[in-house]
């Protein structure tokens, strides 16, 4: 369903009445409608993926903004479209594949919704014999929702990797692994499928090209993916040894001493306008401003490729 949010809930309700699960790209659906639809879907043995869900792979078939990756034995559930895209492409690059990647919408793990679709999809992944390893990706859930999910995953019959972007885990549990970055989550999942550790990625850089602290240069990061922006802000703060709490005001994940990380896919920038994965006009405008700013040392971007992107 991809129509204005004011009408999307009604169409989703009709689809459920017809015995159909719903993939809802529409945003601006009230959280009350979201909860009601998901409760109805649960009672019927169906699922509502969304609202504001832009990515999915079902039995190897891509839906919406998705990459053409190999089919395999890793299942993913995510409250993050670009997070799912990044995970699936890294898994594919490492030589493994994905059977199902289910987007649940960014609000499913809020207290008001209670993780209804997440819990149902965990059950579905456990019942699916083609799934050998499960990966969960989202921003940190509401505490009561997190406790419920963690209790369920602790009794999951297959290895699980969780990534709550912004948290820095310090330990793993038996058959229950906790990742810090999307790359780590993908490598853990691939390693669990193969039964062997996958080495970390390495990047060779020429430090002579680095700016010095006294140069006073800043990072301007303009992202189309919310999870990728969140991860970039987290890693930049870590590198700067900065304890500033996370932001999410009008898409700003970081604003510190001239350094900015912005999610241009935030609702603040997409009201009545295409998402930047479809139309990069807003990002081009921001990039020009950054280039014109003499303090800019680095312009940082994500480039989301795949079906539906930058069409």
PLM regions with names:
Residues 1-311:
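Catalytic-core regions of core metabolic enzymes
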């Amino acid at each position: 369903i991809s129509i204005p949010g004011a009408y999307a809930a009604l169409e989703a309700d009709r689809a459920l009445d017809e015995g159909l699960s719903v993939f809802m790209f529409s945003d601006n659906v009230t959280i009350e409608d979201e909860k009601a639809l998901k409760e109805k879907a649960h009672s019927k043995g169906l699922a509502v993926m969304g609202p504001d869900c832009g990515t999915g792979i079902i039995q190897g078939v891509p839906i919406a903004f998705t990459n053409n990756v190999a089919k395999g034995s890793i299942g993913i559930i995510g409250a993050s479209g670009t997070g799912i895209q990044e995970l699936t492409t890294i898994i594919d690059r490492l030589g493994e594949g994905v059977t199902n990647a289910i987007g649940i919408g960014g609000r499913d793990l809020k207290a008001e919704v209670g993780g209804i679709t997440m819990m149902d999809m965990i059950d579905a992944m456990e019942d699916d014999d083609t799934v050998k390893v499960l990966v969960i990706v989202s921003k940190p859930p509401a505490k009561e929702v997190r406790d419920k999910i963690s209790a369920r995953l602790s009794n999951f019959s297959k290895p699980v990797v969780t990534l709550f972007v912004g948290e820095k885990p310090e330990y793993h549990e038996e058959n229950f692994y906790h990742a810090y970055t999307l790359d780590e989550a993908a490598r853990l999942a691939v390693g669990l499928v193969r039964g062997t550790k996958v080495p970390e990625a390495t990047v060779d850089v020429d430090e002579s090209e680095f700016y010095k602290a006294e140069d006073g240069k800043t990072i301007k990061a303009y992202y189309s993916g919310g999870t990728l922006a969140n991860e970039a802000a987290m890693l930049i703060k870590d590198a700067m040894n900065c304890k500033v709490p996370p932001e999410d005001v009008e898409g700003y994940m970081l604003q510190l001493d001239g350094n900015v990380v912005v999610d241009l896919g935030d609702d603040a920038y997409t009201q009545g306008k295409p998402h930047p994965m479809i139309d990069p006009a807003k990002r081009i405008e921001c990039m020009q401003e950054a280039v014109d700013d003499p303090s800019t040392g680095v312009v940082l971007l994500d480039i989301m490729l795949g079906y539906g992107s930058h069409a």
